Amino acid sequence: MYNKNNNNNNIIDDNDYDDDDDDYNYYNNNNYDYNENLISKDTKKQKDLEKEPLSKSIAFISIGTLTLLYVIVELGAALYVGSLTLLSDGFHNLSDVVSLVIAWWAQKAAKRDSDNFMSYGWARAEILGGLTNGCFLLSMSLYVALEAIPRFIRPEPMESGLIFMIVAGSGLAINILGTIVFACTGMSHAHSHGGGGHSHGGGGGHSHGAEKEKKKEKHGHSHDGADKEKKKEKHGHGHSHSTATTAVGINSEEHNHDDHDHHDHSEESHGHSHGGEKKKEKKHGHSHSHGGGAAEGININDEHDHDHEGHHDHSEENHGHSHGGSEKKKEKHGHGHSHDGGVEKKKEKHGHSHDGVEKKKKKKKSSGTCLGMDLNMFGVFLHFLGDAISSLFVLITGAVIHFTHGKWTEYIDPAVSLIIVIMIAATSAPLVKRCSMILLQKVPDDIDLDSIRYKIAKVEGVVSQHDLHVWQLVDGMTIASVHVGIEQGREFQSIASKLRKIFHKEGIHSTSIQPEFLPINSFTGGATSDPNFCIQNCVDDCEEEWCCKKSADRIRMRNFNSKNSNIVDINDI
C-alpha cells in the first residue's frame, strides 16, 4: 500500500462518480471517445460561428461610420462653444471608433486557424481587444479628470446651451442605437469554450442512450425479472430507463405514466415508490434516467448520494425507494433522477441526483459576462452604454445652461465631466482586471485547486502529484496540466481516465496529464516518500527551464545531505 489513504473509503474507483453527467455517460456507454466528440462539437460550433460574422461586420461598419461622423460634428461644436463636457464626450466617442476597429479585428483574428507560429490560433485576440478597449476608456477618463479640475478653480462662463442640446440629443440617439445593436449581436452570437455543457432543471432531465428497441408504455413496468403480472397503475411521471442487458448490448425503454402510485419489483430489480403513502398527494413532475448493468459479470459499486424528502424502504436485494413520502399533503416537486444500478449478486447501490425540493449541489459561476457576451463584445457594449449615459448628462447640462442663469451654472460643465469620468472608470476597471487576469493565467474563480488535489490524491495508484496548473485560454475555456507520480506496474490509461473525470466534473475539458512512474525505495519498502518527487527534470543542463524545478532542488539538497548509499540521483533512474 503506497497511498497513505489507501482504503475503501478514500480510494477513487471508476464507480465512485455519480455519473450524473449525461454527456459523459452517453459517450462512455456507447463506446465513443469523449474527447473526440467534444472536438466534433467544437468543430460544429466553429462552423456555425463562421456563418455568423456577417451580422457582426455589418454592425461594426455601420455603427462605426455613424459614430465617426458624429465625433467630427461634436468635436467641432466643442471647440466652437469651448465646452469641456462636449470635448470629453467627443474624445470618448472617438475612442469608441478606435475600439470598434480593434474589436472588429479581434473578432476576425479569433477565427483564424492555428498554425506553426500560433499553436492556439488567435483565440486570445478577443481578450486583447477587450483589454485595449478598457485601457482606452481609463486613459480618456484620466485625461478628462485632469482637464476638469482647473475649471473649478477658474470657471468659464458657458453659452449656447441650445447647441449642447442638439449635439447631445443626436449623440444620445446614436449611442442608444449602438448599445442595443451590440447587446443583441453579442448575446445572439455569444458562445462558451467549455466543451458542450447541459443544464438540467427539476423535472426536465434527459437521457442519452441507444435509440434501438425503444418501447413506449402508458402504465406500470418491471425491470430485469420483475413480476409482470403485478397490478399496473396509471402514473404521472416521465421515465427514461436505459438498461444495459449485456456487457455490450444496450436496451432502452421509455415510459409515460399517469398518476403514479408505486412500482413493484422482484429480486434484483429496482423498486420505486414516488408519492405520499398516507394522505393527499399533489402533482409531481419526475424525470428519471436509469442505467442498470444487468450482466452477471458486471461489478459496479456506486456510492449513495441521496437528497430525498421523505424515507427509503429497502429489503434484501430488492431496493424500494420512496421519494417525497411525507405524512400529509405534498407540495409540487420537480425531480431529475439519474440512477446507475449495477447489479451484483448481493449488493446494489444507486446514485441519485434530485433537482427540486432541497437541491444542495453547489452551483458554479458562469464564466461569461452578465449578458453572456465575450469580453471583446462586452467591452464594445460598455463603450456605447457609457456614451449613452454621458450624452444624457451632456443633454442635461445643455438644458441647464440654456434655461437657467447664474454664477453657479459655470460649475455645471466640469462637474458633469467628472461624473461621466467616474462612471466610465467604474465600468472599465473590472473589464481591464478580468482581461488581465486571463492573460496572467490566473486560476478561474470557480475552480478550487485544493479540492482537485484532494480528489487526485484519492485515485488508486497515484502516490504523488505536483505542478498542478489551471488557467483560461479565453473566457470560458479552461485548461489544466498536472504531473502525477504513479506506482510502477500500474496501467496509466485507466488512471488517466479517472483523473480526466475529475477535471471534467470541474468544467475543465482540456487537460495534460504527465505520468511519472516512480521507483520503489528499498529503504522505505514503498514508493519514494517525497510527494513532490519529480523525475522529468534534466538536473545538470537546464536548471532554469524546469517546470517543476523546486521539486528537483529538494532532491538535489537531499542527495547532498544524504549518505552515498541513500542518494537518489535523477540521472540514474
Curated annotation (Swiss-Prot):
Induction: Down-regulated by Pseudomonas aeruginosa, PAO1 strain and PA14 strain infection. Residues 79-85, 147-161, 402-411 are extracellular. Residues 190-367 are annotated as: Disordered. SUPFAM superfamilies: Cation efflux protein cytoplasmic domain-like, Cation efflux protein transmembrane domain-like. It is a multi-pass membrane protein. The chain crosses the membrane at residues 58-78, 86-106, 126-146, 162-182, 381-401, 412-432. One of its GO terms (biological process) is zinc ion transmembrane transport. The keyword Zinc applies. Residues 1-57, 107-125, 183-380, 433-573 are cytoplasmic. GO terms for cellular component: Golgi apparatus; membrane; pathogen-containing vacuole membrane; phagolysosome; recycling endosome. Keywords: Ion transport, Membrane, Metal-binding, Transmembrane, Transmembrane helix, Transport, Zinc, Zinc transport. Residues 252-279, 301-329, 337-346 have a biased composition (Basic and acidic residues). Residues 231-240, 280-289 have a biased composition (Basic residues). InterPro entries: Cation_efflux, Cation_efflux_CTD_sf, Cation_efflux_TMD_sf. Its main location: membrane. GO terms for molecular function: inorganic cation transmembrane transporter activity; metal ion binding; zinc ion transmembrane transporter activity. Belongs to the cation diffusion facilitator (CDF) transporter (TC 2.A.4) family. SLC30A subfamily. This is Probable zinc transporter protein DDB_G0282067. It comes from Dictyostelium discoideum.
